[in-house]
């Protein structure tokens, strides 16, 4: 067809397009949208409802709807953005107001009940966890003893400031770390590993890797944490155990915004976060001002907290940042986030929300690529047919012989609603190589999950709860080459009849 013959066809196409005017329908899109270069006029059906324009001006009702949606969508994105700092702030709320521990004092956890408040806690190892307000303490000392420990110091956006223990610069040989507040100008004393925090508040978390519980408890007692100004006579660390129910994760409903407002007023605003602060300003959350939302703002924030969490759930389950670890498998790397959260041209907003909705903390040691060092985490939420794991159904997981871990491996079960260790009547939430599991003749293991134990397999069973979704982390501590080259592979969950 020649160019001359195309011209009448082009005129006909333009004429048909003009007849559609502002209400022309595009493909399979369910909404009528203005065509390019056509004015906004009349009634237009959109994703946020019907909008009306007169002389291109939105009607009063449309104006209110547009601004409400603008504020609402900004709040849902601020929810995803605020998850990491809201989680740490919530732990700090409990330590300061419920447990009333001294500033700089940490919590000690060992049993399942003591760990039930922590997002995706390791069920196998004891912990020391807590937060420190550097504005209150000034430079802060963490005296790490010699021994098998693994942990980190994170800022309040859950970015690692340093690893400590076997994967840290002390390499398990012990060291004194001195953490300074942002912009600290004081002298750096000798004998300390000095690190500056980008935030006024920090998190400290350490797990004891000793297999013997007595040795692990002894190692816990050797940690010392205190303000540098008290170094001549540091107070004795008590490291109390949690004395009440708590939640180390982002709270629900208005409590999320209350925690977020409170911590943002005690923190430095980074350049990368200024636009999110602008979104929060629309709904009554401002640095330097009290949080007194209007009835309209409160209703909007309540809805945004619910939808924001729904987005976090979907974003987490989709795990768009990672692919199946083995082709055709329902196992993915749980931590698909760079610990720095920074890529060449963007910061990892979705990836950060994906991990920190279901878990807490990051460190270089948690994303190790070095055999024999650190740890790795694989997550599975579905059976081999792609159906979500259901607490009312029973499953088998076949663990191939010689799991690739120098220290130990474990499979821990978590409630999908709370993202914490499953709180079952059995009072067991994990299986690991440190337990007396039934081993098959070829060295493999068959693990079982469901409301009731299969006869003769009780040692290898974790009880699930009908009405609750659940998922697992497969952890390898000091993973071996067989993990990294993928020569070792685990099966998917098989639903039992």
Put a short name on every predicted segment.
Residues 8-17:
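Bacterial N-terminal signal peptides
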